[in-house]
Amino acid sequence: MSCPASPSAAVVSAGALCLCVATVLLATGSNPTALSTASTRSPTSLVRGVDRGLMRPTTAAALTTMREVPQMAEGFSGEATSAWAAAGPQWAAPLVAAASSALALWWWAARRSVRRPLAALAELPTAVTHLAPPMAMFTTTAKVIQPKIRGFICTTTHPIGCEKRVQEEIAYARAHPPTSPGPKRVLVIGCSTGYGLSTRITAAFGYQAATLGVFLAGPPTKGRPAAAGWYNTVAFEKAALEAGLYARSLNGDAFDSTTKARTVEAIKRDLGTVDLVVYSIAAPKRTDPATGVLHKACLKPIGATYTNRTVNTDKAEVTDVSIEPASPEEIADTVKVMGGEDWELWIQALSEAGVLAEGAKTVAYSYIGPEMTWPVYWSGTIGEAKKDVEKAAKRITQQYGCPAYPVVAKALVTQASSAIPVVPLYICLLYRVMKEKGTHEGCIEQMVRLLTTKLYPENGAPIVDEAGRVRVDDWEMAEDVQQAVKDLWSQVSTANLKDISDFAGYQTEFLRLFGFGIDGVDYDQPVDVEADLPSAAQQ
């Protein structure tokens, strides 16, 4: 049967069909064989049409059970005369009403089409839609997604781009396998982005470790894309399961005691114990579980106003920035959020639950950087928090018998580093220098080198500096690298920014955080934003 040429014709056709069926029902009464095929017990073409139109886009449970489907067919066969003798008149009235409604709608559309034919046709589906229940076959979450940047935040994410980026890191970890034994059951607190994600990938695909991750990221909602961390975690779990590796992720606030309890239960049930605990949290605020007080971190110097140059990444402009010093309360709050207290609480919870394996290690990520960034970083509020992390490492080692190491990593483009004044300009210059020298590393390169050469080296003992830190910022802090960056710092301006720095590389890396700018992804094609977390079924 050909489709009606227009919405109006469709309405008329439907009304006429309903009217004809009603007439036949009334005429046949107790002889419904006129509606069935005499030589079969199957539904007629009309019923098969209903089956094709309704059963396929919905589940069988939504309409009838599969056991009831044969009964429906029998109801339309010539042998069910007693049922149809009563059903004919009952069906006729609703069908006549439906036919009348359809003809009335056609008449309304025809009148409006005299004045506004295009508008009438556009409004007709809306007028009809509210009369019928919504059908899943007409909904979709596929859309074209392009980056939308506001300051140092990208408000959109691309599911396929995020997945491809995770796959790239997995490929790198597999291509650089360890040469000595390493962790086998790993807990990563903050597993969905940055160093946490790359550490998890290295542990799983380098050491074949079972990994349990804790993260906080919003899933897709009402057709809106999820956070990048959600898509990253989904992609990681899929790849791990395909490789036959245990991978489970808990979505929750790492600062919350309930999340710690859920994690302990998951370890007890699935892993027994863990031999490496990775703490990789960067957050703007934290509620103290003991007091219920909300603390907010800030990025400010201490003691005096700090003025230096930075880059406006939206406009590609080098400008001066002045930052007022933090108050004592702001310093204390920043330490409360970004210091070592929560790391310590995690190890306490794991130790008291008996889920730390003998010889287990724990690491927390930190940064020191060059002196030009110290006023706003190492000597500022965030630096006070990082120094507290080092104090916590000593307490953890002494109190719980679990060796704890602050890991000082390289400056990289992350959502956190993008928010720190001065640092983005430093990174643009640093990338230029290190790429020219062939020593540039991203997150995955850093974490592969951390685990294979620093934390689990061939001699077995972690390699630390005089303060007990594991350093993977050693290539960044090399004297020749820092001197070259200083020379460029004194020259850089808006006019030459793109010539003497790797500003283009900075922008590319920033977009990649959200799944954009990935080779092999067609960003002009619609993509489904829905993505289920494989391990969610276990929770």
Curated annotation (Swiss-Prot):
* CC terms in the record's Gene Ontology section: mitochondrion
Output the PTM entry.
Answer: The N-terminus is blocked.
Please list the residues that make up the active site: Y377
Q: Where does NAD(+) bind?
A: 190-195, 216-217, 253-254, 281-282, 386, 412-414
Annotated substrate binding sites: Y367
UniProt KW keywords: Fatty acid biosynthesis, Fatty acid metabolism, Lipid biosynthesis, Lipid metabolism, Mitochondrion, NAD, NADP, Oxidoreductase, Transit peptide
Transit peptide (first-last residue): 1-68
What is this enzyme's EC? Answer: 1.3.1.38, 1.3.1.44, 1.3.1.86
Tell me a Gene Ontology molecular-function term this record carries: trans-2-enoyl-CoA reductase (NADH) activity
Primary localisation category: mitochondrion
Additional remarks: Euglena gracilis exhibits the metabolic behavior of a plant in the light and of an animal in the dark.
Report the function annotation for this chain: Catalyzes reduction of trans-2-enoyl-CoA to acyl-CoA, an important step in the fatty acid biosynthesis pathway, which is performed in mitochondria under anaerobiosis. Preferably catalyzes the reduction of short chain length substrates such as crotonyl-CoA ((2E)-butenoyl-CoA) and (2E)-hexenoyl-CoA. Can use both NADH and NADPH as electron donor, with 2-3-fold higher specific activities for NADH relative to NADPH. Originally thought to contribute to wax ester production under anaerobic conditions.
The subunit structure is: Monomer.
- What's the protein here called? Trans-2-enoyl-CoA reductase
> What are the top taxonomic ranks of the organism?
Eukaryota, Discoba, Euglenozoa, Euglenida, Spirocuta
Gene name?
TER
